[in-house]
């Protein structure tokens, strides 16, 4: 490290530019499309700067996670400060506040939101990121506990943090802004009623969005035994390598088929994504079962079950890949209403 103040500031500046490049590319394309070269070009520094400042690309990613969490913590503090300015709120204010906070995070905290999601995906492949996930979880547990306390919903912070885990991801996907925001409000209204021990209906905006999603469901190429085998392989590649790794060659290798066979049955990259979507959706939806079953658990037991489910459910990680890709890539807009509004057992477990 250099001694003079000017040189020290230059080093810090280039390191921060690299961190900013990581955050920008997490939001625009995801880790699977990133490289040391692309980050160095965006930051305007030589590739060697990554290794000079951070020692490795992985350590740069970890530094970017720490930076993102610091910004997320400031976002939380700002929201709580605004709440403190008006004093305690009644439980009736809770659903509107919950929807407003999720919406603000997805819009104004968008880069940090993508960083958090990339951390979750990275932990499935790199155990070192598991510690980072726990640091994120601690931020949200504290924040939602404080929000619930201010709305006379004390004791529901852990459960609401889990709802936020789910809905903040779905709300990153932009379909019809007005409908998306209204549907989010419907869900938060239902959540508040559920916490009060009441039945939670779907809500008019959410029901309308779900109906449209079902009506416009794309035709999906999973027809016969061979097509199903290809779709299973596509879902496995998606889970392991991300959307960038979802190629005809990778799927052929995963399915133990020739490239020619896969290319004949699934002709385009878009068809390959559709095949993976079909298999992941069927797995997560549980064969179409949508009616929620009664949950006979204490709140603490339910939190434990849901956290374990998030950590261990491989199909959900593949779905997360699709959700994040749809949030970034306009070419996947044909799947957006289905990804946002057609859900299976995962949501039924909560509502």
Label the model's feature ranges.
Residues 122, 150, 232-239, 249, ...:
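Long compositionally biased, domain-poor regions of proteins
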